[in-house]
Swiss-Prot record:
This is DNA mismatch repair protein MutS. This protein is involved in the repair of mismatches in DNA. It is possible that it carries out the mismatch recognition step. This protein has a weak ATPase activity. Keywords: ATP-binding, DNA damage, DNA repair, DNA-binding, Nucleotide-binding. CDD domains: ABC_MutS1 (cd03284). Transmembrane segments: none annotated. GO terms for molecular function: ATP binding; ATP-dependent DNA damage sensor activity; damaged DNA binding; mismatched DNA binding. It comes from Jannaschia sp. (strain CCS1). GO terms for biological process: mismatch repair.
Length: 877
């Protein structure tokens, strides 16, 4: 070691060497300091000053720091920028260090926690309404498994996951961090990173299934995992790696994880990554939660209810009984608005039980986590009392039963805690007066020392009969009893001398003490510290009582979330005039008056109504496909998306925006809409489209719903038409699924006469005086043109370009009608002049316009105005 290295810096270097992959927050008094490369990286990431402290190997030591009291905000910034942070705390005070090792002793420090994206628990570092998942992927002899947990709520699950399903499942969960074996191929690690998760490679030993089983059995205090499920080796391996990582990052203080729940992919509606993105389930394409389906659905009052909504929306059920039970619960609150309003008013006061419990388990909780548990359980009890006398559907009845069973803990917390505890335990004042006699005494001595002394003085005056007796204080004797020499004689002799102990005689005064006064003096001098120490002990006692009831608290949290979600979906259904879908085992798909929930909500803000449309894709024994044609901007993509969204909403457990809906269970939803490239992988927009289409054709089963928008548009016309044609035939003949297929290749409409399960539909438009009016109505039939030039005009292309485009279009269409070759037609077109073509002459005024110009509204009677309106209507038709 360099002889010039100070003991403190030697300690830092030793601790840093043990945590090379993390920024080290090294506690020094009221600050966390960072040194060397850590300081350079942190200063840049946090935009704070970079300074220096001493030298090492002849070079200045870079240094920066952040205040300990506001460290969480800096931690959040660093975590979001991809850093891992080691929290290195002082484990003793300087005075203790000096007693241990002399004046040059260094305060003992240890890393108490590694902060990573998937291991956050503090409210300030988390999104209250979203899970913060840590996931782990294991591959054992070609068998894959995915495990995930949220240590801030205790949620812990696992499922078998073939490599081909890893991307879609991670897209469903949106974990913040994914643990993988360091032998996992780089391409797959990059794919995980593209989903927005941090990838943390671990050694193969972390995934060893034998040691993993031992870790899990030890965590849950069982001899075997068979009571939790029949886990495959890969599942055990993935779960074990999670526990191993938590032991590493939490330094042995493991979170409260519920027993692992085995999840089956067959019981969830399958949605791949592209479909989730295209349908904007939880995040809009523009980024953020706003204008996503989740934002439109969410009327929950609690954080737990919001997380449950996201979990179900990202993983809708395919179990008919489960779906119907959820609909029945929503229907109850949809019908009984008084009970729902009363429930929601109570739910607004419910804190986040799960996260408060998790922080207490990890010893990161404070007084307000105790009060959060108290307030949450009190609210649960009030709701239970109100709802247990109501005739509820089975799912809600079970939720209400979950709210019970914690009366003793609730009574304890009600008695022990003040109404509004402090944020920090060190501030004191969390225990209610009257709960603990010794604490009350300490507080009284601390806050009312003078009055206690005065009371004691009055007692002594009465006991001695010496009215001149006083209790005084100085820095030498402390508290003492003083009286004149004249009266002292009485106190120096029995029986009073047995109680009053002589301490000092001065020229005119005699001073005494008593055992009671000496004890009181000690108590007064130490009362403040004693009160804090008693509260610390009581805090730990209450924390232990809460942790002993963790199962009941978790159960209550789940019951509250279920009630909240059912009521929230009912409120949203009432607001939007939504209907309960009829769910069936067959392949029915009949929706009348369907509306896009997100678009409708956006239009409503501007006072515009949404044009509803029907959809019938019912199929038994074969495919049911609608081929949709029509112009751009007419609403084809909206129509495709809305029907897919209604399926997802229905199988989530929500009502749907429609007049009525009958939906046979859907196993998969695939969406190929929109345009995007993947430049990082060298993929063009067309290549991305083809990859997504290939996924659909290879994976869609006969219970899938597929929506395809303009397949083949990114290449030459005949190439694109050929691909679209073959894709449609494959969906019909091989996949035999329900599908909506939008295209501008009008030639494909002829397939309806050849494919039994194919019908044509078009989005209606109206032409009026050279303008196109989009009616947004889906009707049977086929479009004969796409109105691309008119849409280009609406987009603001220069008039010269529009005029030239119309000339070219007319020539091409004429060539097709006359059977000429396209090249010959193009060769016959006049060259585009260098000067812009003259703007088209204004069209002559129509009869309607001429009549309107001649009208003077103020001079017309109501009858004349009505007659004129009928005349104008006749002219239009």
């Amino acid at each position: 070691m360099n002889a010039q290295v100070t003991p403190m810096m030697a300690q830092y270097l030793e601790i840093k060497a043990a945590h090379p992959d993390a920024l080290l927050f090294y506690r020094m008094g009221d600050f966390y300091e960072m040194f060397f490369d850590d300081a350079v990286a942190a200063a840049e990431a946090l935009d704070i000053a970079l300074t220096k402290r001493g030298k090492h190997n002849g070079e200045d030591i870079a240094m920066c720091g952040v205040p300990a009291h506001s460290a969480e905000s800096y931690l959040l910034t660093l975590i979001r920028k991809g850093f891992r942070v080691g929290i290195c705390e002082q484990m003793e005070d300087p005075a203790t260090a000096k007693k241990r090792g002399g004046s040059k002793a260094v305060v003992r420090r240890e890393v108490v926690r590694l902060v990573t994206p998937g291991t956050l628990t503090e409210d300030t570092l988390l999104e209250a309404r979203r899970h913060n998942y840590l996931a782990s992927y294991a591959d054992v002899r070609g068998e894959g498994a995915l495990a995930w947990c949220d240590i801030s709520t205790g949620d812990f699950r696992v499922m078998r996951c073939p490599a081909v399903r890893l991307g879609p499942e991670l897209a469903r969960l949106s974990p913040k961090e994914v643990l993988v074996s360091d032998g996992l191929d780089i391409a797959r690690q990059d794919a995980i990173i593209e989903l927005g998760a941090a990838v943390t490679p671990l050694s193969p030993g972390s995934f060893d299934s034998a040691s993993a089983e031992q870790r899990l059995a030890g965590l849950f205090s069982v001899s075997t995992l068979e009571g939790f499920g029949n886990f495959a080796r890969a599942e055990v391996s993935a779960m074990g790696a999670l526990i191993d990582y938590l032991e590493l990052t939490q330094k042995g203080a493991l979170p409260l994880l519920r027993a692992p729940r085995q999840q089956s992919a067959d019981r969830l509606l399958q949605l791949d990554t592209a479909t989730r993105r295209n349908l904007e389930l939880t995040q809009a394409l523009s980024g953020g939660r706003a204008n996503s389906l989740l934002s439109v659905l969410d009327r929950t009052q609690t954080a737990g209810g919001a997380r449950l909504l996201q979990r179900r929306l990202t993983g809708p059920s395919t179990d008919l009984d489960v779906i119907r039970a959820r609909h029945e619960s929503v229907s109850f609150f949809f019908s009984d608005t008084l009970i729902r309003d009363d429930l929601e008013a109570e739910l607004r006061r419910i804190p986040d039980l799960d996260r408060a419990l998790s922080r207490l388990a990890l010893d990161r909780g404070g007084p307000r986590d105790l009060s959060a548990i108290r307030d949450g359980l009190s609210g649960a009890a009030r709701l239970s009392d109100k709802l247990k006398i109501v005739d509820l559907p089975p799912l809600l009845e079970g939720a209400v039963q979950d709210l019970q069973g914690h009366d003793e803990l609730s009574a304890l917390l009600d008695e022990a805690l003040v109404a509004e505890p402090p944020v920090q335990l060190r501030d004191g004042g969390l225990i209610a007066p009257g709960y603990h006699a010794e604490l009350d005494e300490a507080r009284t001595l601390r806050d009312e020392g003078r009055s206690v002394i005065a009371t004691m003085q009055a007692d002594y005056v009465e006991a001695t009969g010496v009215n001149a007796l006083k209790i005084k204080h100085n820095n030498v004797l402390g508290y003492f009893i003083e009286t004149t020499a004249t009266h002292a004689e009485k106190m120096l002799n029995p029986p009073l001398s047995e109680r009053f102990i002589h301490r000092q005689t001065t020229a005119n005064q005699v001073r005494f003490t008593t055992v009671e006064l000496s004890e009181l003096e000690t108590k007064i001098l130490n009362a403040g510290n004693r009160a804090l120490e008693i509260e610390r002990v009581l805090f730990q006692s209450l924390r232990d009582a809460i942790l002993n009831c963790q199962d009941q608290i978790g159960q209550a949290a789940r019951g509250l979330a279920e009630l909240d979600l059912s009521a929230a979906l009912a409120r949203r259904a009432r607001e939007g005039d939504w209907t309960q879908p009829e769910m069936t085992e067959d392949r029915a798909f009949m929706i009348e008056g369907a509306r896009h929930p997100v678009v409708e909500a956006a239009l409503a803000k501007d006072g515009t109504s949404f044009v509803a449309n029907d959809c019938d894709l019912s199929a038994e024994g074969g495919a049911a496909i609608t081929l949709l044609t029509g112009p751009n901007m007419a609403g084809k993509s909206t129509y495709l998306r809305q029907n897919a969204l209604l399926v997802i909403m229905a199988q989530t457990g929500s009502f749907v925006p429609a007049k009525c809906a009958k939906i046979g269970l859907v196993s998969q939803v695939f969406s190929r809409v929109g345009a995007s490239d993947d430049l990082a992988r060298g993929r063009s927009t067309f290549m991305v489209e083809m990859v997504e289409t290939a996924t659909i054709l290879n994976q869609a089963d006969d219970r899938a719903l597929v929506i395809l928008d303009e397949i083949g548009r990114g290449t030459a016309t005949y190439d694109g038409l050929s691909i679209a044609w073959a894709t449609l035939e494959h969906l019909h003949e091989t996949n035999q699924c329900r599908a909506l297929f939008a295209t501008h290749y009008h030639e494909m409409t002829s397939l309806a006469s050849k494919l039994d399960g194919l019908t044509n539909a078009t989005v209606a438009v109206k032409e009026w005086e050279g303008e196109v009016i989009f009616l947004h109505e889906v009707r049977e039939g086929a479009a004969d043109r796409s109105y691309g030039v008119q849409v280009a005009k609406l987009a603001g292309l220069p008039d010269a370009v529009i005029a030239r485009a119309q000339v070219v279009l007319d020539a091409l269409e004429k060539g097709e009608r006359e059977g000429g070759e396209r090249k010959a037609v193009i060769d016959d077109l006049p060259l585009f002049a260098m000067m812009p073509a003259p703007a088209p002459a204004p069209s002559a005024p129509s009869l309607v316009e001429e009549k309107l110009r001649a009208v003077h509204p103020d001079e017309m009677t109501a009858r004349e105005a009505l007659n004129l309106l009928y005349e104008l209507k006749a002219e239009l038709s």
